Regions:
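Divalent metal-dependent catalytic cores for phosphoryl transfer on phosphate-bearing substrates
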Residues: 51-58, 64, 71-197
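Charge-biased, low-complexity intrinsically disordered regions
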Residues: 194-213
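Charged, compositionally biased N-terminal leader segments and the immediate start
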Residues: 36-45, 50
Length: 219
């Protein structure tokens, strides 16, 4: 049974601006304040991940925490919004269909949401809950049928959520392909086919990175 995807909760509004913020003469511009707030959230989230053992879990390229930080940085290079970058940093918090190690429980989602915000946490859960075998082929379709592997529910998420998911997936897979040439050689052709089928969901920077990383010959 297919149901529409409903997002939990609402984002908190930006703090009220005071003075002539846009030109910075009487205070920091709104964009700078948001960037500073996002950087603070990143640091707090990284400490949470480290406290849950992410800095000691082996992962291609070093540790899980190092991988998570690289994914977040890559999303930033592509111009992703702060919530997407935060989700990239925490994308393995509930484990994934390809990496079963959990740092936190899906039954306690408020804990992570309290650190990175509800929008970012929704994407973390969405990414973690993906039944990849079922969902990947449907993701670029108009309805975008998506199966939650934790509950078995089939959803029809909005395209904006699917775009964020595709961007995060690309950053995750391209980081692994970059740091591990053997895995790149083994899985690169399949990843290229996957991301080609998702072209309508990927940003131009992400699409260029796909070709730079996995479409060129392995040397």
């Amino acid at each position: 049974m297919t149901s529409s995807f409903r997002q939990k909760g609402r984002l908190s509004p930006d703090p009220p601006q005071t003075g002539r913020q846009p030109d910075g003469r009487t205070g920091r511009p709104a964009g700078a304040r948001r960037q500073a707030a996002a950087s603070g959230q990143q640091a707090i989230a990284a400490r949470l991940l480290a406290s849950r053992g992410a800095s000691g879990i082996p992962h291609p390229g070093g540790t899980l925490l190092a991988h998570l930080e690289r994914v977040s940085a890559l999303l930033g290079q592509w111009g992703a919004r702060p919530p997407v970058r935060l989700a990239g940093l925490c994308h393995a918090y509930y484990g994934t269909d390809g990496f079963p190690v959990m740092l936190g429980e899906p039954a306690s989602r408020d804990e992570l949401a309290g650190v990175i915000g509800e929008e970012a946490e929704r994407l973390v859960y969405f990414y973690a809950s993906c039944d990849r075998h079922f969902s990947y082929p449907h993701l670029p379709e108009p309805a975008g049928a998506f199966r939650d592997r934790f509950t078995g529910t089939v959803l029809s998420p909005p395209q904006a959520m699917r775009r964020d998911f595709a961007e995060l997936t690309a950053a995750n897979e391209l980081d692994i392909a970059t740091v591990n040439p053997e895995l790149r050689a083994q899985y690169g052709p399949a990843l290229l086919r996957l991301f080609t089928s998702w072209r309508n969901l990927l940003s131009d920077p992400a699409w260029r990175a796909v070709h730079t990383t996995i479409a060129s010959p392995v040397t």
